[in-house]
Amino acid sequence: DSDLVYILNSMLSNCASTSFISYSYPTCTSLIPKLTHKYAIKTGSTDSDCLIFGYTEDILMGVWTGYDDNRNTTSKESLASKNVWADTIEAFYKDKEAKWYVQPKNVVGSLIDTKTGKLATNESAKKAILYYLKGTEPK
């Protein structure tokens, strides 16, 4: 269903958003200075490897770093996959405009307080537009 796919893509784009730092730390905030476009991003890691996949409407790219013999990666090595991914996907867009997905008619955006999960107010320190199926958004 294109409505749910749009919502999922938007959720995954929050991996590189500072709007959620109030209660958690998104996994790709270290990449924010490198990223000039909106990407849906999913990361994963174990003690011995790191994985990042990211995409737009134009491109899907993933990078894996790690060891096949279960040696632990260092913190520096664990950042390598993210940095290689960011540098490469940004190079792809060097002279191009990135396309993002068109919001379906049955999806609505609401300004949400990212700490409480409720509608944002003037007192909300961190806010983000989150997407919902029409009729399921917070009131």
Label for each model-derived stretch:
Residues 1-138:
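A penicillin-recognizing enzyme superfamily signal
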